Amino acid sequence: AAAGGDLDGRQTKEPRDGNRNMLNRLGSTPFLQAAKVADVQMMQLLVDLGADPSLTTDQGATPLMAAAGVGIWKIGENPGSNTEALEAVKLAWALGNDVNVSDVNGDTALHGAVHRGASNIVKFLLDNGADVDAINKKGWSPLSIAEGVFYPNTFNRHPELVTFLVELGADPNVGMRRPEDLSPEERLQLAEQKN
């Protein structure tokens, strides 16, 4: 039906070999790439044409994770607004993507949403069962990411999400944190543990 048509000025032809789940050189499907840039219309078109919305990258990232903010966008790649990304997250979730799946790094969709600074996505994920204290392989929780564990490299810190996550039940004692994010009492305890 939509194949060979026009979607906002883009030609929408079926792949020549009919494989709607073909992996690109980075190990990602067209559906996952559409989720990554929050293109809900393309995501829906691909599903309508038979794409499998449950396929992950070879690193284990799901389309829901990509839409939420897991992974690094290429220079010039537009991840969409937080509102558009929320719609992509909702569609991936409605199509069966699990909010608590983690990739090979232990990152979940919630880690990505916090890194992205998207409180709307954070709330949606938590409302649908995401683990607020999930720890990735580096020992980082969503709260530690909001506090700025990436800050030295990305200058990415979200104080408003720190408050939001704690209000929604995040445990401040879970996950690794930067020394400068610790209270004076916590710094003293850490120093005593090292001695």
Q: Model-derived features: where do they sit?
A:
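Solvent-exposed, polar/charged alpha-helical surfaces in well-ordered, non-transmembrane soluble domains
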Residues: 32, 41-44, 65, 87-90, ...
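Ankyrin repeat boundary signal
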Residues: 9-11, 22, 53-56, 99-102, ...
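Ankyrin repeat A-helix N-terminal signature
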Residues: 21-25, 33-39, 66-85, 112-119, ...
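Intrinsically disordered, low-complexity segments enriched in small/polar residues
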Residues: 7-20, 77-79, 188, 193-195
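Ankyrin repeat domain, specifically the short helix-to-loop turn at the C-terminus of the second helix
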Residues: 1-6, 44-52, 87-98, 123-131, ...
